[in-house]
UniProtKB/Swiss-Prot annotation:
Compartments where located: Cytoplasm
E.C. designation(s): 3.1.1.29
Record bears the keyword Cytoplasm: yes
Gene name of the record: pth
Source organism of the structure: Campylobacter jejuni (strain RM1221)
Subunit structure of this chain's protein: Monomer.
Annotated protein name in UniProt: Peptidyl-tRNA hydrolase
Location (main, coarse): cytoplasm
Annotated active site: H19
Swiss-Prot/TrEMBL keywords: Cytoplasm, Hydrolase, RNA-binding, tRNA-binding
GO MF annotation list: peptidyl-tRNA hydrolase activity; tRNA binding
Record's signal peptide: none
Pfam families tied to this protein: Pept_tRNA_hydro
Catalytic activity: an N-acyl-L-alpha-aminoacyl-tRNA + H2O = an N-acyl-L-amino acid + a tRNA + H(+)
Length: 181
């Protein structure tokens, strides 16, 4: 079983914020797939299954406690592989990077996952840039002119993710799909 986690915060006030690009990508995947809804309170998030071996998770624990949801799903399904999609303020909007393991880079959602599940998982890092105030920047909504770039990046990321799921070759996917901005 492969677990793909899209990080974000629940609630209308967080929709379309920079911190929610992980949720946005999961929503894009669901829009174009036949899925089974496995959401259950024990998973502390929205959980969906595509085919026989792909799980998509949107934790409902808020960003700083994402690891609680990821651990609950991982413990129940014994996933062999995990891919986490998240915003990254250290790369510009329009950029896309791939990584396996390493530090959380100060991202509280990753920090929570690392603490509860370890850090040996693949990461899809979607650039959102860095504002003057980090918290208000990541919790802020995209500007209309940024939404055009975001839409293109999410579509590109979806293709990369689907290929990564099939091929399990992060290095090749990184070479083929990484974007600079």
């Amino acid at each position: 079983m492969i677990l793909v986690v899209g990080l974000g915060n629940i609630g209308v006030e967080y929709e379309n914020t920079r911190h929610n690009v992980g949720f946005m990508l999961i929503d894009l995947l669901l829009k174009e797939s036949n899925f089974t809804n496995l959401t259950n309170s024990k998973f502390k998030g929205e959980l969906f299954k595509i085919g026989s071996s792909l799980l998509l998770l949107k934790p409902s624990t808020y960003m700083n406690n994402s690891g609680l949801s990821v651990k609950a799903v991982n413990d129940f399904y014994k996933c062999e592989r995990m891919i986490v999609i998240h915003d990254d303020i250290d790369i510009n909007l329009g950029a896309l990077r791939f990584k396996k393991g390493g530090s959380s880079g100060g991202h509280n959602g990753l920090k929570s996952i690392d603490t509860l599940c370890g850090n040996d998982y693949e990461r899809v890092r979607i650039g959102v840039g860095k504002g003057e105030n980090v918290i208000s920047h990541v919790l802020g909504k995209f500007k209309p002119e940024e939404e055009i770039t975001l839409s293109k990046v999410l579509e590109h990321t979806k293709k990369a993710l689907l290929e990564l799921i099939e091929n399990d070759d992060l290095s090749a996917i990184s070479s083929k799909y990484s974007l600079k901005a």
